[in-house]
């Protein structure tokens, strides 16, 4: 289930963002978190596993005109590689339902994942 991050979930977000390979240190993680929080057209979404109730995936998205750009996709270590494709398809469908008026697209770094999810959905 996709949920939009609340202010009181910053530690969860910072923890998941720290697994992102493009954020080298805690200062970079904090800057990225602050960047998302500084504009209402940006959201951080968390995927809550329905069985464990753990937050297992973080998505950083930005609404740009009629598009939703998926800027970050971060899986927690508890998500096995073999689960990522299936989970990605479920997340893609949930994003379509949550943002029905938006075209879903990836950034330069996430486009290949978004395209794979789109082709399989």
Q: Model-derived features: where do they sit?
A:
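Short, basic/aromatic recognition patches
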Residues: 27-35
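Conserved beta-hairpin
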Residues: 40-57
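Conserved acetyl-CoA binding element of GNAT-fold acetyltransferases
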Residues: 66-78
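Short amphipathic alpha-helix that is part of the acyltransferase structural core
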Residues: 1-28
